[in-house]
Design a protein with these regions (language model features):
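Intrinsically disordered, low-complexity regions enriched in acidic/Ser/Thr/Pro/Gln residues
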Residues: 1-123, 127-128, 132-135
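Feature captures the catalytic cores and cofactor-binding loops of soluble hydro-lyases/lyases
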Residues: 141-174
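Catalytic beta/alpha-barrel core
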Residues: 73, 138, 163
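Short, solvent-exposed amphipathic alpha-helical segments in soluble enzyme
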Residues: 5-7, 16-18, 140, 149-154
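Positively charged, proline/Ser/Thr-rich regional signature most characteristic
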Residues: 124, 137-144
């Protein structure tokens, strides 16, 4: 996978979660990051529960070509017939547009890599008071979101405590 070499443990955790390979942080026993010499290659090894490993072996999705519309690598369109669980939190429907405008005004300044390179996407976790609690960046928009989700899993954050803001388009699978 091509990713920016920061927050790799969070990326691995978030990626495993969003791909349905794990259900919770406790499913992951260990994450090892191994730089490979002087090149850009880094190996990330993850040790998961035996149940999660069996699920991984049974998966029928290739992860090549994961950018784009979300259809690449999907074995069947039945994948898209799955309905996401309803969010019992009503805060999202009452999100104040002024609060969102204020967050957006600060959002770009908080993107350190983007400000240095102009080439990254960001995903941020924002609480209902408008504070950017966490922000992760990557050259790939999916990767930035996976890094953020991994960071949230590491902190045992609850989805109803805030919302996600991304600097890119949010395609179907995101």
């Amino acid at each position: 996978m091509m990713t920016t070499p920061s927050d790799l443990a969070e990326f691995a955790l978030g990626f495993a979660y969003t791909e349905g390979l794990i259900e919770r942080r406790a499913d992951v026993y260990d994450i090892e990051i191994e730089p490979q010499g002087h090149g850009a290659a880094i190996i990330v090894r993850m040790t998961v529960s035996s149940a999660c490993f069996a699920q991984l072996k049974a998966a029928r999705r290739t992860l090549l070509g994961r950018t784009g519309c979300g259809l690449c690598g999907v074995d069947s369109l039945a994948y898209f017939e799955q309905q996401p669980a309803a969010n019992p939190n009503r805060e999202a429907s009452r999100l104040d547009i002024g609060l969102l405008d204020a967050v957006l005004a600060r959002f770009e300044r908080l993107q350190i890599m983007r400000n240095q390179t102009g080439t990254t996407h960001a995903a941020a976790w924002v609480n209902w008071q408008g504070e950017v609690v966490l922000l992760r960046e990557d050259v790939g928009r999916h990767n930035a979101l996976d890094k953020l989700i991994g960071a949230l899993l590491d902190r045992d954050a609850h989805p109803s405590d805030g919302f996600v803001l991304v600097s890119s388009r949010a395609s179907y699978e995101m």
